[in-house]
Curated annotation (Swiss-Prot):
Name listed for the protein in its UniProt record: Small ribosomal subunit protein uS14c
Assembly behavior: Part of the 30S ribosomal subunit.
Keywords: Chloroplast, Plastid, Ribonucleoprotein, Ribosomal protein, RNA-binding, rRNA-binding
GO MF annotations in UniProt: rRNA binding; structural constituent of ribosome
Similarity annotation: Belongs to the universal ribosomal protein uS14 family.
GO biological process, one term: translation
Subcellular location: Plastid, Chloroplast
Keyword Thylakoid: no
Length: 100
């Protein structure tokens, strides 16, 4: 299980991304539409002044149960270990173990 501080940090980043998403999107669009170089530089400076954690690139997918960052399945939001356990316990609807 991941440290609780790491999980909380990731949740804080998600909130920050959601909070600044519209502002960041508007600034990026304005940079694309800007005609002069000076205007682009000013808009880029404004974009850089936003918090670093407001960028979606800094988000990392983590398992909802354990907080594990690796082996993450997007369809379920779980790591491979938890996915396997839940599939064996028939907790996940529609998931069956394959047999050849």
């Amino acid at each position: 299980m991941a440290k609780k501080a790491l999980i909380q940090r990731e949740l804080k980043r998600q909130k920050c991304v959601a909070q600044f998403a519209e502002k960041r999107k508007a600034l990026k669009q304005a940079i694309k539409e800007a005609s002069s170089l000076q205007e682009k530089l000013n808009l880029h400076r404004k974009l850089q002044q936003l918090p670093r954690n407001s960028s979606a690139v800094r988000l990392h997918n983590r398992c909802r149960v354990t907080g594990r960052p690796k082996g993450y399945f997007r369809d379920f939001g779980l790591s491979r270990h938890v996915l396997r356990e839940m599939a064996h316990d028939c907790v996940l609807p529609g998931v069956t173990k394959s047999s050849f």
